[in-house]
Design a protein with these regions (language model features):
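Hydrophobic face of amphipathic alpha-helices that form TPR/SEL1-like repeat modules
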Residues: 1, 14-23, 53-60, 89-93
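TPR/TPR-like alpha-solenoid repeats
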Residues: 5, 20, 57, 78, ...
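Short acidic, glycine/serine/threonine-rich helix-capping segments at coil-helix boundaries
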Residues: 99-100, 110-140
Length: 140
């Protein structure tokens, strides 16, 4: 069912199938590269969780040829999608990303005029506020 939906271009199914291949599942042989390829395909379709997954995989160094700047662009796009889970994950567990990716995210937020603080990789109150504003929340 996932494969059929993924073949029809449904980003949710592509992302879910990517997870199943990346992790391995009952009846499905583990194939991390196929999982990454599917995550990238879903991210290209602007699927927020796929963009977040790709950023995490880049941060872990498993996506060839991608840098912390690439991870930050995926995180920023995921934030801008307006999906609360992405904001919650970034807000509650920012240290799951390495300092270089966190700095690159701050730089991406600054480039898009959401952040004017120090680019230091510390996800403090200023960066948190900037992420909420980029997400679409107003106020503090």
């Amino acid at each position: 069912l996932y494969r059929k939906s993924a073949d029809l271009g449904f980003a949710d199914a592509i992302n879910d199938l990517g997870f199943l291949y990346y992790q391995g599942a009952s009846g499905l042989k583990r194939d991390p590269q196929k999982g990454i390829d599917l995550f990238l395909k879903a991210a290209d379709l602007r699927h927020p969780q796929a963009m977040y997954n790709v950023a995490a995989l880049i941060d872990d160094g498993v996506v060839a040829g991608k840098t912390p700047d690439d991870a930050a662009r995926y995180l920023y796009a995921a934030l801008r999608s307006g999906v609360r889970d992405v904001l919650a994950q970034l807000s509650e567990r920012p240290n799951q990303f390495k300092p270089a990716t966190r700095k690159a995210l701050q730089a991406e937020l600054a480039k898009n005029r959401f952040y004017s603080g120090k680019i230091d990789g510390s996800i403090g109150q200023g960066t948190q506020r900037s992420m909420r504003i980029a997400f679409g929340e107003t106020g503090n």
